[in-house]
Every structure is written in C-alpha cells, then in structure tokens.
From Swiss-Prot:
One Gene Ontology cellular component: membrane
Transmembrane segment boundaries: 4-24
Membrane topology listed for this record: Single-pass membrane protein
Domain of life of the source: Eukaryota
Gene responsible for this protein: LASP1NB
UniProt main location, coarse: membrane
Keywords: Membrane, Transmembrane, Transmembrane helix
Species annotation: Homo sapiens (Human)
Biological role: May play a key role in the skin fibroblasts (FBs)-keratinocyte-like cells (KLCs).
Name listed for the protein in its UniProt record: LASP1 neighbor protein
Keyword Repeat carried by entry: no
Location in the cell: Membrane
Amino acid sequence: MLDIFILMFFAIIGLVILSYIIYLL
C-alpha cells in the first residue's frame, strides 16, 4: 500500500515538472 502511495507521489511530481517544461517552451 505504501509503495502505491510513493508511486502516485512521484507521478504527480513528474506531471508538474513536465507541465513546467512545456510552459517554458
């Protein structure tokens, strides 16, 4: 259960970084 929470946490961080990079482009 904790592993799923960590994966979701990193997935959200990845989406934020990806959207930030797209915003800079």
